[in-house]
Amino acid sequence: MYKTFFKLVFSRMDPERAHHLAFRWIRLAVRVPVLRTFVAAALAPRHKELRTEALGLRMHGPFGLAAGFDKNAVAIDGMAMLGFDHVEIGTVTGEPQPGNPKKRLFRLVADRALINRMGFNNDGSLAVAARLASRTPVFRTVVGVNIGKTKVVPEEEAVGDYVKSAERLAPHADYLVVNVSSPNTPGLRNLQATEALRPLLSAVREAADRAVTARRVPLLVKIAPDLADEDVDAVADLAVELGLDGIIATNTTIAREGLGLTSSPALVGETGGLSGAPLKARSLEVLRRLYARVGDRITLVGVGGVETAEDAWERILAGATLVQGYSAFIYEGPFWGRAMHKGLAARLRQSPYATLADAVGADVRKHS
């Protein structure tokens, strides 16, 4: 039903306008008690065998919404209603910013992919922190907060910008993510180099600890799929050394070659980060490499090209304790979360593993 609707309606609309329209519907639905209860019962079924513990947090399952969909923390309950076990908001920057000029979001329907050059459009850390502080949760879900650099802040002043966001947002976050991997903010990916990343992560960790003294807010870093293998290893080693809680692998890619893209050259040639199905192989490769390097010492989150329960299961076997998606949600619609949960539960029952935790990294351990 949704695929027909997408073909007849959403596919004919500007992608960003369609996003805002869908967003509005989700937010409206969650405001009606009877409707949200019915929708959650239908689309967010709970499977006991999928219960997950990660980052010191308990979740209904391992499957969550990647950052980028809810940039301003306005639809957390709506996304939980649709079956996401954790919702990562953002990317949020120190100061509010409009992002890059439109048109900045493109669908590659033939490739089940998106290209975006949104540029961290968001309300800024002060406004988002206030929104989170005033929120009365309807559904119990884990909320991650993804922070990035304000565009106008020079690279040499980036640490202070991230620290400002961390101090404001850490009190309202179940976990924090340092995003240094978006291709749409000039110079941002330079911060993935360990000599720049070390002081940044250390400063954000200290800022979060200053802002929240009653608990330790887990801190993760999100990396790009375009890192060379030796740089992936370097980030993994640094994460362990600094006592980071996790790594999210991966963000969007700037690559176009070797991905088997069949969409029109004009679309494929659009500047920005590519997400969705074509990213699957490289994101999985990075995840496997990370798990081989860090094992169970830190939590790994697999994202990039996750479309089906089988994809999610593959990420778990490759070392992911948590799995995220976003692009496939655009193509699969509101029933996607339900299908992911049902498929994952079935896959676990068919496997030799008693729990999801037993399955994490099993393929990598088998070949090491």
Curated annotation (Swiss-Prot):
This is Dihydroorotate dehydrogenase (quinone). GO terms for molecular function: dihydroorotate dehydrogenase (quinone) activity; dihydroorotate dehydrogenase activity. FMN binds at residues 67-71, 91, 146, 179, 222, 250, 276, 305, 326-327. Belongs to the dihydroorotate dehydrogenase family. Type 2 subfamily. It comes from the Bacteria. One of its GO terms (cellular component) is plasma membrane. Coiled coil: none annotated. Its EC number is 1.3.5.2. The gene is pyrD. It comes from Streptomyces coelicolor (strain ATCC BAA-471 / A3(2) / M145). It is found in: Cell membrane. Pathway: Pyrimidine metabolism; UMP biosynthesis via de novo pathway; orotate from (S)-dihydroorotate (quinone route): step 1/1. PROSITE patterns: DHODEHASE_2. Binds 1 FMN per subunit.
